[in-house]
Amino acid sequence: MKRFALLIVMVSLLLAVPVAAQPPGEKPFLAGVATSNITPWLGGGLVGNFGTPPPAKHVHDELHARCFVLDDGTTRIALVVCDNIYISREVLDDAKRQLTEATGLPADRVLISGTHTHSSVSARWSNPLQPAKEFTEYQRFIAHRISDGVRCAINNLQPARVAWSTVDLPGQVFCRRWLMKPGTELLNPFGEPDQVKMNPGNSPNLLEPAGPVDPQIAFLALETLEGRPLGLLANYSLHYVGGTGPNHISADYFGVFADRVQELLGADRQDPPFVAAMSNGTSGNINNINYAVPYPKRQPYEQIRRVADECAQAVCREYKALAWQDQARLDMRQREL
């Protein structure tokens, strides 16, 4: 199956030029943000685990496409983070097609990702290798809503400043694949022999994690020229947290992080609204459980809130030291592999 590899490059100018001192005719850096509700209706199967997906019976928190549009006067790009674990490429291609037709923004200037929440309804085909001839009702819906969200972010474009940084948060990421003592049965989740054990629990046969983790949270921040927070896009290599209510639709810690950042920055009830998002990083072997110690019993959503708060607190502490830029050059490269 062909896949896209996208590289986004933001290179700041060597000297940031205050907007008031820009040479005549120089275009300001613009940013616009928006969200679009992509919550499915109840009854669809909640995906992310093995076995038959159970039907969704309750919406604990709404799912969104969180949209960021950046424009340096020459290049315009859109970044979208969707609260969904599975969205077929064909659905994303259709969202880009709609967006290009409505705005002229080229499809290769749009990056769309999913958060990997395990409490969403799938927007991919039942057999990803054999797409159906027609989209399901939810696939049509989510494609429209992604396109709508980016269009609204374009409508909200305004002169802005940009900054970026990183902060380490090692206490919430753990390798879920472990080397085990000789003689331990090693089967993967599909029942096939393996060299390590995935999600081994607090087994007495644990030796050590089979690989490293990436503790870094990277983030891009946007603010208005008056210094009002506009948007924040973060990335963390944590699979998901889980521990939701039974048969609940939820954005998991990704959604709580967005709300908590807005609260910590004092950016609620703005017009246009502040938008934060946490995108999913390189987390294939990383989850939120440290199997080296007993796992404490939590109430539904308790661990989600704990993780989201620690991430948001770490980012907002680093936010205070950001060096803001009035200008930044944008580029986006796409290669099909």
Where are these regions (language model features)?
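N-terminal secretory signal peptides that target proteins for export/translocation
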Residues: 1-2
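Bacterial N-terminal signal peptides
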Residues: 5-16
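Conserved beta-alpha junction segments in alpha/beta enzyme cores
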Residues: 22-113, 117-274, 279-282, 286-292, ...
